[in-house]
Amino acid sequence: MENNVKKETIVDSEKVEKQQLVTAPVVNKKENTEPKAKTFKRETTTSNFEERVVKIKRISKTTKGGRMMRFSALVVIGDKNGTVGFGMGKSIEVPDAIKKAIKNANNNLIKVKQTKKGSIYHDVNGRHGAAKVMLLPAPEGTGIIAGGPVRAVVELAGFTDIYTKSRGANAPMNVIRATINGLLQQLTPKEIARLRDKSLREI
């Protein structure tokens, strides 16, 4: 009899455990209701401008902690269709300095005049500081007679036939400014006729 009682109690206890397992409330894991962070994609813009690095210079700055070495980059950009610009950037790395210079150049874009044949309308003289640049029109097929910073400006501006001559100081920044100042002095035949109160045929 005792054995039967023990078996019954064991069976009853097993039934109770099964019932508890079945009737036990299912605890759901807390769902993450916080809004997910949005992922932003960096927009990539295609630029029609070409870049030309004119000069890279290493500069140092003396501080209490010692000398700090950095690089400066001078860049000229243009679309070869009359738009040109220049800029300078500084950073501890050369690529970063070039990127800053390009960004600065995009903020300093100017539009220059040119003939249909890719030359200038007349002789001009540009000056900035002690730098002087003379620009002369050239016949078709001559090419770009220029060097250094002057060539970078006129080539990226879209000129194909032009004579140039640089005099005075040869600091790249001043030469670039002098070249652009000269290009901005151009007058088209219509503008000259208007200033002289004459028709295009009379000029």
From Swiss-Prot:
Organism this protein belongs to: Ureaplasma parvum serovar 3 (strain ATCC 700970)
Q: Which family does it belong to?
A: Belongs to the universal ribosomal protein uS5 family.
Q: Which HAMAP family match?
A: Ribosomal_uS5_B (MF_01307_B)
Question: This protein is called what?
Answer: Small ribosomal subunit protein uS5
* Keywords, alphabetical: Ribonucleoprotein, Ribosomal protein, RNA-binding, rRNA-binding
User: Which InterPro entries does the protein's record reference?
Assistant: Ribosomal_Su5_D2-typ_SF (IPR020568), Ribosomal_uS5 (IPR000851), Ribosomal_uS5_bac-type (IPR005712), Ribosomal_uS5_C (IPR005324), Ribosomal_uS5_N (IPR013810), Ribosomal_uS5_N_CS (IPR018192), Ribsml_uS5_D2-typ_fold_subgr (IPR014721)
- Annotated gene: rpsE
Q: Which residues form the S5 DRBM domain?
A: 49-112
User: Which Pfam families does the record match to this protein?
Assistant: Ribosomal_S5, Ribosomal_S5_C
